[in-house]
Every structure is written in structure tokens, then in C-alpha cells.
Amino acid sequence: MQNLIRRFLFQYWYFGQPPWDTGVSPPELLDFIQNHEPGRAIDIGCGTGTNAITLATAGWKVTGADFAPRAIKLARQKVNNAGVQIELLVRDATRLQGIDGPFDLAFDLGCFHGIVPQGRAKYLQQLNRILAPGGFWLMYGFLKTEPDESGTGLAEWEVDQILTFLSLIWRRDGFDKGDRSSAWFLFQKPEELVEI
């Protein structure tokens, strides 16, 4: 029931201006683009497509996925106006059915941290399935300051769980606009496949 309510709220937010939809790509993504050759990228939880458009404009072949149909509708309008080619799909990040890799980059600006804990393992299985060996996962998320804290955010033990199949290239801790603890992570999948 809680998951259904969250889905409704996300869909509803896209009838206005969601607080996370700034229309500006973050410097972490821009730095990544500047320092890596274009390849295939997936924007998981792409919203209205701002970051997918940034990637496509830089030469990446991009797929954007979001579970909110309204977000994908708005993204299609923005993509059309930008004159770029992006595959946009209404998909749940814990399933990603019909999306095949390999992707050189999976980008996630606040999607993973909002998934209910029991869905995160499914998300990570999908990520492992679609990410190319040597591929990157650039992810932003809120952090939990207490191990048993409820709500949106990642606990340190969850970051440790990710490290069982991805290598941490860098981590940048900080605070969001509301002074909530958050971090950017750049993970890389090893060249040899790891089962999770």
C-alpha cells in the first residue's frame, strides 16, 4: 500500500514542478561526460529527461526509464524540442523489462534512494544485468545518519552491499538544499562478471 501511495504522489508531482526537477544537469554528470568517451547510457528514474538530453547532446546513445507516465510524456516533449534521439520508456527501476544492455553508464539522480528497501535488491540485480563489464554507475542519494532510520536514504550497510559487486571509484559526501546528508557515488562494474 505504501508503495502504491508513493507512485501516486510521484505521478501527481509531475502535474506541477517536482522539487527535484531543476532542469539543470549536475556538475558530477558533466564531469563524467567530459572525462569519458560516449557510449550507451541509461538514465534510471529519468523524470522529464534533462540529464538524458545532456548525455545525448554529448554523443551518448541514451535510454531513459521512469515509472511515472506523466514524466515520460514531458520528457518526450523536451527531447523533441532538443532535437535528439532518446529511447524513453515507462518502466519500474526494479524490473526494467524489455531493456537490454550492455550500458557503459547507468545514471541515477535520486531514484535508488527512494525505492523501498525490499525493492533495492531487485534494482541492483537489474543494474548488474544491464551494466557492461567495466561500466559505471553514477548515483546520487540521500544518506541515513542512523542505521535503523526509516524513510528515503541509504544506510552505510547498503553502500557496503553494493561494494560486493561494484568497485567504488569515488564518493563525495555533502548536503542537499534542505541540509540533508547526501552523497554522489561513482561505482564501476568489474570486467569479470559477479553474481549477486
Segments predicted by a language model, with ranges:
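Class I (Rossmann-like) S-adenosyl-L-methionine-dependent methyltransferase catalytic domain
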Residues: M1-I42, T48-G101, I115-Q126, I130, ...
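A conserved beta-strand element that flanks and buttresses the S-adenosyl-L-methionine
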Residues: F107
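Short catalytic micro-motifs in class I SAM-dependent methyltransferases
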Residues: G110-G114
